[in-house]
Regions:
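Beta-strand-rich modules
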Residues: 446-468
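Catalytic domains of carbohydrate-active enzymes, especially glycoside hydrolases
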Residues: 32-58
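Glycoside hydrolase catalytic-domain groove-lining segments
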Residues: 193-242, 246-317
């Protein structure tokens, strides 16, 4: 299975599809419900949620532009008693789940009576901005002031909240209603002089919104993703040779969504077409459309995710193909034949939870049994490699701690594990089977570790756009290793005098840097201090960068229970790895356990970088 893959589900708020499940819930009940959705995503090894925060020209945050959403309290404009968007982002990030805020640009209401809107609603204050169609109210996409207002309303959330992405779905101009005409002739007469027909003008109105949102989002937050989930068919090949071998509704013509253009122009970071049909469906075959969209994104920087119809699987009234538990999982197997497909989004959360006919359980068993990293995007450099500071067997597994490398704080970390000795296979870190956990913290307990056996752990760091660092040095945990700690030269347990310099020159260093000093005929030792939990035997290992100009006989001092022992190490060779000084009997307590002395007759810098102490 892929190591990098977006795994997401839509959490819809309009008409209380997913969250909140009903209006009028208490703050604590609403929050508990949302946490349960995140917990479900985490249980399924998903790494993102797409949450509807502006369903009907309203807001799930205290917006200066639009009223509080009626789907929170039952009454539009009523304060729910907390900031839902701030709460949701915080809870998602605490689980290392990305939060993509989902906005519907033009829909105002699921009715056509403006008097039912709160009196301060912009659509009520500006009647010329709206039109009724098909029993609903919409903002008119052809009015420039409307477009600017919608963009401002969305950008308020972008600039004020730590969201990871902005998401638009398939609702642009309304879907056609038989016998009705969109009442925008006056706007076309006023603003459409440069276009030969109203249809090209309408498409341009949507194009302007998409292009301008792309520009504004990335000006405010260059790392934030902007994506659209359009209807799955752009155009049929029978209409346009660039179209797909399908015979369904054409979103280019029906709702004026030129989604292919957005990809080819690079106006979106990702496209997530809603390919809501089964494999073999005559009018719109899943395999045909997945291949077509793969061709569209090929050669661009736009990522392709697939919108999946979890709501169809096992549902009453659906085609027989959807009554087969393997329909959805077969979609993801088909995706693997297209390297352009980098993940999936499932509609919607309640259907993921329902797991009708076991379809979701089958899919997660086949494809989501291990965690996955979100696909990287952009060209930012990866963070520096972190360093593992401790790896200790505890009653419920192995407890790990680490620290960042370099000056830039990573957004998240990935933990890898190999059974037995350190990894030698160069493909180890590309293999999803070795990825154990992702987290935004700097500690993790591996509860899957057996009580016996040897494991080696590694940690990598990710930036905001998911570029991954080189791995940390491997940390070995053995059956008897009830205590193991690393003291790096940047840790609080390290001390050295002013004659010790700091360098990050060598790539063989442990962590961000190392210490160096000239040899002298006095000790002036650098010391590594830690708390030794109990008296007994310990293995002492040292890490240093090697260089032909470094010292050939650097004195390392071990403070054993019987007194100091000196072990001389040739630091010209065998650098960039753990090197054992031997096993020693240590006393319990907190003290300077290992030192690096400057007192040597040989020339070349003596190096103090990191020490590892493991109980035998």
């Amino acid at each position: 299975m892929p190591k990098r893959q977006l795994r997401a589900m839509w959490i819809a708020s309009v008409v209380n599809i997913d969250w909140p499940s009903q209006t009028g819930l208490s703050v604590s009940a609403q929050q508990a419900e949302f946490r349960s959705w995140l917990d479900l995503a985490a249980q399924k090894n998903m790494n993102a949620v797409v949450v509807q925060v502006r369903p009907t020209a309203d807001a799930f945050w205290p917006s200066p532009y639009e009223p509080w959403s009626q789907w929170l309290t039952g009454t539009q404009g009523t304060n729910p008693g907390y900031d839902p968007l701030a709460f949701m982002v915080s809870e998602a990030h605490a689980r290392d789940i990305e939060f993509h805020a989902w906005f519907n640009p033009y829909r105002i209401a699921n009715h056509d009576d403006p008097s039912r809107l709160v009196p301060s609603h912009p659509a009520r204050q500006n009647p010329g901005w709206r039109f009724a169609y098909g029993g609903k109210l919409y903002y008119n996409p052809g009015i420039p002031a409307v477009r600017g207002f919608i963009e401002d309303a969305i950008m308020d959330a972008v600039t004020r909240y730590d969201i990871d992405g902005v998401h638009l779905d398939d609702y642009f101009y309304p879907y056609p209603v038989s016998g009705q005409t969109i009442p925008d002739a006056a706007a076309y007469a006023e603003y459409g002089a440069d276009f030969g027909n109203i249809h090209d003008w309408r498409r341009n109105n949507v194009n302007l919104l998409v292009r301008e949102m792309d520009q504004r989002i990335h000006t405010a937050k260059p790392w934030a993703e902007f994506g659209v989930s359009p209807f799955g068919i752009w155009r049929n090949a029978s209409t346009d040779p660039l179209g797909s071998q399908t015979s369904g509704l054409q979103s280019y013509d029906a709702i004026y969504a030129d989604s292919r253009l957005w990809v080819r122009q690079g106006w979106v970071d990702y496209i997530a077409p809603q390919i809501y049909w089964h494999i073999g469906y005559p009018a719109a075959d899943y395999k045909v459309l997945t291949a077509w969209w793969s061709d569209v994104v090929r050669g661009t920087d736009v990522q392709l995710f697939v919108g999946q119809a979890a709501y169809r699987a096992g549902a009453t009234g659906q085609d027989p193909a959807w009554q087969q538990p393997d329909e959805l999982t077969n979609h993801l197997y088909d995706n693997r034949g297209h390297p352009e497909v980098l993940g999936d989004v499932f509609f919607s959360a309640k259907d993921v939870r329902a797991n009708r006919i076991g379809s979701i359980a089958r899919l997660t068993s086949d494809h989501y049994s291990r965690p996955a990293l979100i696909p990287a995007y952009g060209t930012a450099p990866a963070p520096a490699a972190p360093s593992i500071t401790s790896a200790t067997r505890v009653t419920n597994g192995v407890a790990l701690s680490w620290q960042r490398g370099g000056s830039i704080t990573p957004v998240s970390y990935a933990v890898y594990r190999v059974n037995d000795s350190p990894a030698t296979d160069p493909c180890f870190f590309a293999d999803a089977r070795n990825l154990l956990k992702t987290t935004r913290g700097t500690s993790f307990t591996d509860t899957t570790a057996a009580a016996t056996g040897t494991y080696t752990y590694y940690v990598t760091a990710m930036d905001r756009t998911h570029h991954e660092s080189a791995p940390s040095a491997g940390r070995v945990v053995t059956s008897g290793g009830s205590f193991s700690v690393v003291i790096d030269n940047g840790d609080a347990g390290f001390t050295a005098g002013s004659n010790w310099g700091t360098s990050s020159f060598s790539s063989q260093r442990y962590g961000g840097d190392y210490r160096f000093a000239d040899p002298v005929t006095s000790s002036d030792s650098a010391w590594f201090r830690t708390a030794v939990p109990s008296a007994g035997g310990y293995r002492i290992e040292v890490w240093y960068p090697a260089n032909s100009g470094y010292n050939s006989s650097t004195p390392f001092i071990v403070a054993t229970s019987g007194g100091n022992q000196v072990i001389n190490v040739d630091q010209r060779v065998n650098g960039g790895q753990w090197r054992s000084l031997g096993t020693f009997t240590l006393s319990a307590g907190t003290y300077n356990v290992v030192g690096v002395s400057r007192w040597t007759a040989t020339s070349g810098y003596v190096i103090a970088d990191a020490v590892r102490i493991t109980k035998l």
